Amino acid sequence: MRLPAAIVALCCMVGVASGEDAMPDSLTGAKGDPVRGRAITVSRQVGLCLLCHSGPFPEERFQGNLAPDLAGAGKRWSEGQLRLRIVDPGRINPATIMPAYHRTEGLARVAATYRGKPVLSAEQIEDVVAFLMTLRD
């Protein structure tokens, strides 16, 4: 479990050090599944994205208004930009309130049972990225 976290941390540092705002390489080496990614995005138990974001999900009530609308996300950002924003949004905006969904180091106020564990697995991150890339309108 520590090796994937170290790889993610290294990828984030390399991207920021070189002035990039993206994490171009897949965390798993494979494309994600957009159907699973949509399920994670709208889930009130897993991704919790709709607590802050809204999007093209008419069947979902009580969508957030604190963060950017997810409609058109695949048009506004590249796959790598979306990946970094999910894995470690603090690399883009240190003042963000969005949690780091895959970074496990340097976090504040994490319950003991969750320390060292990412919110989403590498596969789940890739699934969400694949789904967000389908949102072109």
Question: Predicted segment positions?
Answer:
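Bacterial N-terminal signal peptides
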Residues: A5-G15
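Electrostatic cytochrome c docking/interface patches
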Residues: E20-R44
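Gly/Gly-Pro-rich "capping" loops immediately C-terminal to redox-active cysteine motifs
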Residues: L27-K31, L50, S54-R91, I97-A111
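Soluble non-cytosolic domains of exported or imported proteins
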Residues: K31, V35, S43, R76, ...
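Solvent-exposed, polar/charged alpha-helical surfaces in well-ordered, non-transmembrane soluble domains
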Residues: V35-A39, G80, L84, E126, ...
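Short pre-active-site segment immediately N-terminal to redox-active cysteine/selenocysteine motifs
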Residues: R44-L48, P56, Q124
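C-terminal capping alpha-helices of c-type cytochrome domains
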Residues: Y101-D137
